[in-house]
Amino acid sequence: MAGRSRYDNPFEEGGGDEVNPFADKASKGGSAGQSSYSGGAFYTTQSRPSAPPATHLSPLPPEPADFYNDFSTPVDIPMDTSKDMKTREKELLAKEAELNRREKEIKRREEAAARAGIVLEDKNWPPFFPIIHNDIGNEIPVHLQRTQYVAFASLLGLVLCLFWNIICVTAAWIKGEGPKIWFLAVIYFILGCPGAYYLWYRPLYRAMRNESALKFGWFFLFYLVHIAFCVYAAVSPSILFVGKSLTGIFPAISLIGNTVIVGVFYFLGFAMFCLESLLSMWVIQRVYLYFRGSGKEAEMKREAARSAARAAF
């Protein structure tokens, strides 16, 4: 840079080390691997980066035509004409009219059946496996619901007593009392539970619902039999029923000396039959007081007299 003033042109070609930095490198005599120019204080000499080696990657497969389309192939749905719409509208109106007619017919029949005293009894109890009809809250008058609920409790109490009786007799059979008493206990349960429902509970339910005097008489007849059975089972003397087939006080006393556990079971059965007897006596007392106080007794006598007169003629 010696001999050059500060006013000289740095891009002017000349001899020595004065080089135009923008001149073609091929016209210079420098080597291909080095830079043939110097750029002064603001230029740095850098080597050009070499090209990356060629890779042998297989090309990607072509994308399907609907790759970026989230919708499936469109389906051509023919639009209904106005004639088809009118036809369907007429069909719907005809079906609606038919349903309204059937609904009115069913309602008319239900009202006629209700006026005649006929009530459809759908099975609704127990809720998990309906086997009987029992809707005290909706069908029984409010002033009679308490008595009906207690009567239903006495029905459930009888079922519980007979089921516990099977357990106790099974324990006695295991201890050597023989299979005969077990079969008798099963027979008591199979006949007693549905018999109690059909012979006295359902007549009482219908009598409370419709206030029928004859149904009250049917209830009194078989409910007295029910009370007599409960009292007999609580005592359980060996007169009518065989041996220890009922969990009464007498079998409990005879078993407590030989097998304590079986004796305790029989004493529990004795207590359950006693409670069932007391509850049943309360129910029949309440029903009888209502029966006499509401005039159903005189009505039943009149109906019985009319029935006897019709039978005589």
Swiss-Prot record:
State the name under which the record lists this protein.
Secretory carrier-associated membrane protein 4
* Record region (Disordered): 1-69
For whether the record's keyword set contains Flavoprotein, the answer is: no
**Role noted for this protein:** Probably involved in membrane trafficking.
- Alphabetically ordered keywords of this record: Cell membrane, Coiled coil, Cytoplasmic vesicle, Membrane, Transmembrane, Transmembrane helix, Transport
Example of a GO cellular component annotation carried by this entry: transport vesicle membrane
Organism field: Oryza sativa subsp. japonica
Q: In this UniProt entry, which residues form the Cytoplasmic topological domain(s)?
A: 1-148, 276-313
